[in-house]
C-alpha cells in the first residue's frame, strides 16, 4: 500500500495540462471490441483503471500497441472467447468496475458475455439493473450463477426495440448503445444519459459506421448495421480533474492556469465553483484561477443557505462533490452538499473533521459545511484514502493544511489521476511517494 507525504501550506503557480477523461476512456476502449479493424485512440490517461482495462483486453486476445504514452492502437480480430469464460477473466473483471462496459460489445458482436458482481469504489449501491434490463430487451438471455457470482448473457441475434430507462445511467446507456449498433432493426432509448463522454462514444461509433440520431439528447435512435469499421478517436480532457485543479488553487490561495479544458464540455462546473466565491476566468479554451486569500459562499436570493447538489447531465457531476465539500471548509459562509445519486460517498468527512473542519453530516446523502474563512487552517493528519474522489479531496485538504500529512492507500488516487504527485510538484507542491 503506497502513501503520500504532503508538506502543507505551499502555494501553486504556473500552468497544468489536463489528462484525458477516465470515464470516457473506459467506454471508448470497450467499444474497440465492436470491430475487427484497427481503432486508434488518442489522449488516453495513463491511470490504473484504464491500464487494467487495456490489460484485460490484451488477455482476451486483442492486439494492443502503445506508440506513445497517451495513444493506443487496438485490433480485436482474434478475441479468445474461451478466456472470457475462464475464472481468471472473472477475477480480473471483479477488481475493475469498468469491465461491465464490455458486456454490450461482447453480446452484440459475439453473442456471449459474462460479468461478475463488480468492484470499484466503495460508495454505496450502484445498480446494474438498467444494463441488464436494456440488453435483455434487445433479446439477450441472462442467467445468474451463484457459484461464480456472475451474470451470463447469451444471444443468437439482437433485435431493436423501444425502451424507457428507469434511470439515466451513463454506463447503462453506453452498454445498451454498444449492443444496439449491431442489432437488427431500430432501437429507441428514452431517458438516455447525455453526458459529454456518452456523446463522445456516439461520435466514435458514428465514425465507425453506426447509425445514431439524437446525440446529445435523452432520446437516442439507433439503426443497427451489419458491421463496423476502424476509426481514429481523440478523448476529451477530464472534467473531474479540471474541477479538482480549481479546488486546489482555491484552497492553497494559488494562481493557476488550467490548459485545454474544452470549456463547452464542462457544463455548470465553473459556475458552481463561482457560487462558492471562487474566481474562475475563461481565457480561450483555458481556465485561469487567480490567487484568492478569501472566497465567500453565495446565498440564494431569499437569503437561504446555498445548496450544491449532483444531478444527471447537464446537472453537476457527482464525482466532484467531494472537491466542493473540502473547498467549502475554508470559505466564508455555509453550504449544504447534497449527494443525491450515491450514498456513503460523504463518509470521508470524519477525516476532515479531525483536521479541524466544521462539518455536520446530516445523513448519508447530506453534509452542512461551516466555512472557516481561512482564519483557522486545517491541521495535518494521517489518513487512508477510501476511494478515488475522496482521495483527491483529502489530498487537497493536506496541501492546504499546516504541517505534514500522510495519505495511505494512494493506489485509489492512482486509479483516476495520472502521476498527480509529479505534476503538482512541478508547479510548487511538495508531495513525496513512499
From Swiss-Prot:
Entry EC number(s): 2.5.1.7
Residues involved in phosphoenolpyruvate binding: 22-23
Lineage, top ranks: Bacteria, Pseudomonadati, Bacteroidota, Bacteroidia, Bacteroidales
Gene transcribed to yield this protein: murA
Key words, A-Z: Cell cycle, Cell division, Cell shape, Cell wall biogenesis/degradation, Cytoplasm, Peptidoglycan synthesis, Transferase
Catalytic reaction list: phosphoenolpyruvate + UDP-N-acetyl-alpha-D-glucosamine = UDP-N-acetyl-3-O-(1-carboxyvinyl)-alpha-D-glucosamine + phosphate
Pathway in which the depicted protein is active: Cell wall biogenesis; peptidoglycan biosynthesis
InterPro entries membership: Enolpyruvate_Tfrase_dom, Enolpyruvate_Tfrase_sf, MurA_subfamily, RNA3'P_cycl/enolpyr_Trfase_a/b, UDP_GlcNAc_COvinyl_MurA
Binding site for UDP-N-acetyl-alpha-D-glucosamine: 97, 319, 341
SUPFAM superfamilies: EPT/RTPC-like (SSF55205)
Gene Ontology terms: cellular component: cytoplasm
BP GO annotations: cell division; cell wall organization; peptidoglycan biosynthetic process; regulation of cell shape; UDP-N-acetylgalactosamine biosynthetic process
Primary localization class, coarse: cytoplasm
Protein name as it appears in the record: UDP-N-acetylglucosamine 1-carboxyvinyltransferase
Species of provenance: Porphyromonas gingivalis (strain ATCC BAA-308 / W83)
Localization annotation: Cytoplasm
Family recorded in the similarity comment: Belongs to the EPSP synthase family. MurA subfamily.
Amino acid at each position: 500500500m503506497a502513501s503520500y507525504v504532503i508538506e502543507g501550506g505551499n502555494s501553486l503557480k504556473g500552468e497544468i495540462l489536463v489528462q484525458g477523461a477516465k470515464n470516457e476512456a473506459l467506454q471508448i476502449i470497450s467499444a474497440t471490441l465492436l470491430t475487427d479493424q484497427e481503432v486508434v485512440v488518442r489522449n488516453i490517461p495513463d491511470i490504473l483503471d484504464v491500464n487494467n482495462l487495456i490489460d484485460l483486453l490484451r488477455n482476451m486476445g486483442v492486439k494492443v500497441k502503445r506508440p506513445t504514452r497517451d495513444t493506443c492502437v487496438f485490433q480485436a480480430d482474434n478475441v479468445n472467447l474461451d478466456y472470457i469464460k475462464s475464472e481468471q477473466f472473472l477475477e480480473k473483471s471483479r477488481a475493475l468496475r469498468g469491465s461491465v462496459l464490455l458486456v454490450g460489445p461482447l453480446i452484440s458482436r459475439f453473442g456471449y458475455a459474462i460479468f461478475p458482481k463488480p468492484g470499484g469504489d466503495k460508495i454505496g449501491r450502484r445498480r446494474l439493473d438498467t444494463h441488464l434490463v436494456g440488453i435483455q430487451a434487445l433479446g439477450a438471455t441472462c442467467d445468474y450463477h451463484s457459484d461464480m457470482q456472475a451474470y451470463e448473457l447469451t444471444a443468437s441475434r439482437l433485435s431493436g426495440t423501444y425502451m424507457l430507462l428507469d434511470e439515466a445511467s451513463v454506463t447503462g446507456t453506453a452498454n445498451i448503445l454498444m449492443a444496439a449498433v449491431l442489432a437488427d432493426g431500430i432501437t429507441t432509448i428514452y431517458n438516455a444519459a447525455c453526458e459529454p463522454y456518452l456523446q463522445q462514444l456516439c461520435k466514435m461509433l458514428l465514425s465507425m459506421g453506426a447509425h445514431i440520431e439524437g446525440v446529445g439528447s435523452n432520446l437516442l435512435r439507433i439503426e443497427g448495421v451489419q458491421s463496423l469499421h476502424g476509426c481514429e478517436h481523440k478523448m476529451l480532457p477530464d472534467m473531474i480533474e479540471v474541477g479538482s485543479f480549481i479546488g486546489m488553487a482555491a484552497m492553497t490561495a494559488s494562481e493557476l492556469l488550467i490548459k485545454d479544458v474544452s470549456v463547452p464540455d464542462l457544463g455548470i462546473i465553473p459556475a458552481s465553483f463561482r457560487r462558492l466565491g471562487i474566481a474562475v476566468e475563461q481565457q480561450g479554451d483555458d481556465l485561469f484561477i487567480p490567487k484568492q486569500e478569501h472566497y465567500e459562499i453565495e446565498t440564494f436570493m431569499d437569503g437561504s443557505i446555498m445548496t450544491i447538489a449532483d444531478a444527471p447531465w447537464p446537472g453537476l457531476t457527482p464525482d466532484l462533490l467531494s472537491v466542493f465539500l473540502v473547498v467549502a471548509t475554508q470559505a466564508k459562509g455555509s453550504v449544504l452538499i447534497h449527494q443525491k445519486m450515491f450514498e456513503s460517498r460523504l463518509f470521508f468527512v470524519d477525516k476532515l473533521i479531525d483536521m479541524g473542519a466544521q462539518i455536520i453530516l446530516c445523513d448519508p446523502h447530506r453534509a452542512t459545511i461551516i466555512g472557516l474563512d481561512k482564519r483557522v487552517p486545517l491541521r495535518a493528519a494521517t489518513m487512508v484514502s477510501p476511494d478515488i474522489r475522496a482521495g483527491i479531496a483529502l489530498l487537497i485538504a493536506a496541501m492546504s493544511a499546516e504541517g505534514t500529512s500522510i495519505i495511505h492507500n494512494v493506489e485509489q488516487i492512482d486509479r483516476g489521476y495520472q502521476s498527480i504527485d509529479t505534476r503538482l510538484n512541478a508547479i510548487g507542491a511538495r508531495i513525496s511517494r513512499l
